[in-house]
């Protein structure tokens, strides 16, 4: 179940790891399985996403939209390469995939890289490292929830929020 859930778009390992933790599975068992399941579709997505757009650009119903996607992607990719360079693109993609927020997983990152025409090696390595980072964050978060329960987590988040708000107010007051 962990392997299959980690391959599902949007859910990915962000859903698979908490499920595994909830089932009481061992982290040394579920972490690599979730990672492999999440990374497995990445090269396939990269290689075929752009090809689907190129195939569809001359089709009657979808042609205009697919052409727009390709043109927008090429323009955005060139702009991104000029402003950030390959190194900047690598780190941006890694962070985008690695911070486990809704809609920022391996599928979305790989689709974006493919549409933006970012090279294969940069895309796959950044997404893979991002998946590893997201897996670590989700595993730690799941363990914390398992140890403290939701009430404990909410209490910690509330304390952090109060500290952040207090520090902002103190800085504003000093000015």
Model-derived features: where do they sit?
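Hydrophobic alpha-helical membrane segments of integral membrane proteins
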Residues: 1-40, 47, 79-142
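Membrane-interfacial helix-loop-helix
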Residues: 1-2, 23-97, 145-175
């Amino acid at each position: 179940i962990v392997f299959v859930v980690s391959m599902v778009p949007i859910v990915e390992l962000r859903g698979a790891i908490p499920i595994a933790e909830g089932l009481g599975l061992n982290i040394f068992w579920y972490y690599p399985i979730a990672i492999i399941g999440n990374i497995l579709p990445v090269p396939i997505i990269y290689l075929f996403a752009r090809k689907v757009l190129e195939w569809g650009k001359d089709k009657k119903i979808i042609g205009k939209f697919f052409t727009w996607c390709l043109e927008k992607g090429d323009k955005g990719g060139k702009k991104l390469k000029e402003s950030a360079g390959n190194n900047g693109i690598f780190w941006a993609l890694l962070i985008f995939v690695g911070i486990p927020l809704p809609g920022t997983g391996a599928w979305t990152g790989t689709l974006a890289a493919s549409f933006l025409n970012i090279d294969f090696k940069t895309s796959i390595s950044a997404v893979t490292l991002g998946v590893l980072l997201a897996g670590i964050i989700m595993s730690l978060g799941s363990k914390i929830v398992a140890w403290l329960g939701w009430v404990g987590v909410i209490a910690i988040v509330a304390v952090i929020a109060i500290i952040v708000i207090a520090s902002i107010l103190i800085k504003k007051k000093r000015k």
